[in-house]
């Protein structure tokens, strides 16, 4: 009885009944719903045409139909050699049914599988987090200058090396045929041995030189302003409205905890990241700068120093919030994929085709690999907490991950050293800005406000004179700013938080192109752009490498121009154009002429570093 009901619900069986009925009236004797049910593999066995007395008349019709189906099956067996391929396809569809939702999911996994394995070795997975790494390493100046000076400095070493080589030479038996010149050359520097020296003394001399210049400048200012430093414009800029600035900065920081709240809701199961969480975080990020920017630029009458500080710090907070949100959002997607694929494998293991099993198994393997990429003790989603986000915000890094390399303890002497470096560098920056930069800036503003009546030739000459006057002071200020932020400040924060990776910058002063400079002069920002802009645009927007590179530079140029707007409250576009001009400089440095002359390339690069920022500042102040 049950088997008969199953046959009456089988669409293919009813089709066979219609086609094999001898009488036209019987071809439509059985009625059934038009709803297409999922096909299942049903074994049809011949049944007796004898009708049971207890069954209704429809059972007799069913028995006749079963016999007809059996006869049709026998015919199919005889034709197996002719249409065997079609029959195998039909049997495969019956044996391994795939619903449309599952088919869409498998297609999605197939498209993603290309980016999840190495191109040369398909057995190795590629993690989304493999583009950025953190390792215990010191900062460049510490490893090359500070640490050797404090631990191994013992005065001049070159003379001692020469004396040692001469003593070694005297102990050897000289060849009779050796000339005096050959002997002298061998004594000075024997083959295979290199004379070594260090420049620790020059490092000390440079800072001493800067200190005496600052001291002399302060004395001159003290005498010329009748014994007071309170009237210094730079001091007033940096010390006004400190309490209001601190409260506003704290409000910006606390507002970024919104991303933690969103992931907390996802963790509790109230919302899903894929739609609700993603949209909520994206809207928050899109509104963060447009809402806060007018507050500290227009509502409060802050100085340009305060405006640029709040803007840059708000951008840092935005990057940290974005990295935290989308790192965990990606792991939510991976976790959901693992659960879905493993459930399908366990539930429909016997009815899935080998190809489907392979796709789902690879999906599970990759998800486990991704979740355990940083540590086998998977902490996700336990890392979603206010304390974890707070510690991430304290670390001198912009790319979030669950674990970072840490030091065993805090070296308080090192903290004091870096704190003194911060204070001393800020003092030098204030003196440089007040003595060397402020007078030139005032003349540039006067040039901007005064119309030129003598023609464009005198105007160009005066502008060039202002530029040449701007270059020395601004170059010194540029170097001091770099040292204060990327070496002194970040190392001090890293030591206080026991953050072990101190690679905040590379040896950018040895660059031979601006392409190298953009990668290594600001490593934290480069890592953020690499993961969350460059690679994310290739994955989400399907950009090519060239398109992703152009998009990254355009986004960076836009934020640089907004920074200039925070200072001058006007859109000029000079810095935006100079940022894009790096493509031309890169193309120039990649020419055969400069590639074969790295020394000349470094000279061209250094010339650009010295003149470029000064030219940009002069343009904004004068035009």
UniProtKB/Swiss-Prot annotation:
- Residues forming the motif FYXDWWN motif are 504-510
Q: What is its EC number?
A: 2.3.1.-
Q: Name one GO biological process term.
A: ergosterol metabolic process
Q: Which residues form the active site?
A: 560
Location(s) in or outside the cell: Endoplasmic reticulum membrane
Segments of this protein annotated with the region Disordered: 20-99
| Acidic residues composition bias: residue spans | 83-92
User: Which GO molecular function annotations are given, in alphabetical order?
Assistant: ergosterol O-acyltransferase activity
Predominant subcellular localization, coarse grouping: endoplasmic reticulum
Q: Which InterPro entries match?
A: MBOAT_fam, Oat_ACAT_DAG_ARE
Report the membrane topology from the UniProt record: Multi-pass membrane protein
> Is NAD found in the keyword set?
no
Q: Belongs to which family?
A: Belongs to the membrane-bound acyltransferase family. Sterol o-acyltransferase subfamily.
Primary role: Sterol O-acyltransferase that catalyzes the formation of stery esters.
Please report the name of this protein according to its UniProt entry: Sterol O-acyltransferase 1
């Amino acid at each position: 009885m049950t088997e008969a009901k199953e046959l009456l619900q089988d669409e293919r069986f009813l089709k066979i009944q219609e086609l094999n009925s001898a009488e036209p009236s019987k071809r439509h004797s059985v009625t059934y719903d038009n709803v297409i049910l999922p096909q299942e593999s049903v074994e049809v066995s011949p049944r007796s045409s004898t009708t049971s007395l207890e069954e209704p008349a429809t059972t007799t019709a069913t028995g006749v139909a079963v016999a007809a189906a059996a006869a049709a099956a026998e015919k199919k067996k005889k034709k197996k050699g002719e249409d065997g391929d079609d029959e195998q396809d039909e049997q495969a569809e019956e044996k391994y049914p795939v619903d449309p939702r599952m088919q869409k999911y498998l297609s999605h996994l197939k498209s993603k599988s290309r980016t999840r394995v190495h191109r040369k070795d398909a057995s190795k997975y590629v993690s989304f987090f493999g583009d950025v790494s953190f390792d215990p390493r010191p900062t460049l100046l510490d490893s090359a200058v500070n640490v050797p000076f404090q631990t191994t400095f013992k005065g001049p070493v070159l003379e001692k090396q020469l004396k040692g080589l001469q003593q070694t030479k005297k102990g050897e038996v000289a060849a009779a045929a050796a000339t005096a010149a050959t002997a002298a050359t061998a004594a000075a520097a024997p083959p295979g041995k290199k004379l070594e020296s260090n420049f620790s003394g020059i490092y000390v001399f440079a800072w001493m030189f800067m200190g005496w210049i600052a001291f002399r400048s302060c004395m001159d200012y003290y005498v010329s302003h009748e014994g007071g430093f309170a009237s210094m414009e730079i001091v007033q800029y940096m010390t006004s409205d400190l309490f209001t600035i601190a409260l506003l900065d704290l409000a910006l920081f606390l507002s970024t905890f919104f991303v933690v709240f969103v992931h907390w809701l996802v963790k509790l199961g109230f919302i899903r990241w894929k739609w609700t969480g993603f949209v909520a975080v994206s809207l928050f990020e899109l509104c963060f700068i447009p809402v806060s920017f007018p507050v500290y630029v227009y509502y409060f009458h802050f100085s340009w120093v305060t405006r640029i500080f709040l803007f840059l710090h708000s951008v840092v907070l935005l990057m940290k919030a974005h990295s935290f949100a989308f790192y965990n959002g990606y792991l939510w997607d991976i976790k959901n994929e693992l659960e879905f694929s493993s459930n399908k494998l366990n539930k429909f293991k016997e009815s899935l085709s080998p190809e489907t099993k392979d796709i789902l198994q690879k999906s599970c393997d990759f998800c486990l690999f991704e979740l355990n990429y940083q540590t086998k003790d998977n902490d996700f989603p336990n890392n979603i907490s206010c304390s974890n986000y707070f510690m991430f915000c304290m670390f001198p890094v912009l790319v979030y991950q669950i674990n970072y390399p840490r030091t065993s303890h805090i070296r308080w002497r090192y903290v004091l050293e870096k704190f003194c470096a911060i204070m001393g560098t800020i003092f030098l920056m204030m003196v440089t800005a007040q003595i060397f930069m402020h007078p030139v800036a005032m003349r540039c503003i006067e040039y901007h406000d005064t119309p030129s009546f003598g023609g464009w030739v005198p105007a160009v000459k005066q502008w060039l004179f202002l530029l040449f006057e701007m270059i020395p002071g601004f170059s010194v200020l540029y170097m001091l700013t770099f040292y204060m932020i990327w070496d002194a400040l970040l190392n001090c924060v890293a030591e206080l938080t026991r953050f072990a990776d101190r690679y905040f910058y590379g040896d950018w002063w040895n660059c031979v192109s601006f392409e190298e400079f953009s990668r290594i002069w600001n490593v934290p920002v480069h890592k953020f752009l690499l993961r969350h802009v460059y690679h994310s645009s290739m994955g989400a927007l399907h950009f090519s490498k060239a398109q992703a590179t152009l998009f990254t530079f355009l986004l960076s140029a836009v934020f640089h121009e907004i920074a200039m707007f925070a200072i001058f409250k006007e859109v000029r576009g000079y810095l935006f154009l100079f940022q894009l001009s790096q493509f031309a400089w890169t193309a120039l440095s990649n020419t055969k002429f400069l590639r074969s002359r790295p020394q000349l390339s470094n000279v061209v690069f250094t010339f650009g570093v010295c003149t470029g920022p000064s030219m940009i500042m002069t343009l904004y102040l004068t035009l």
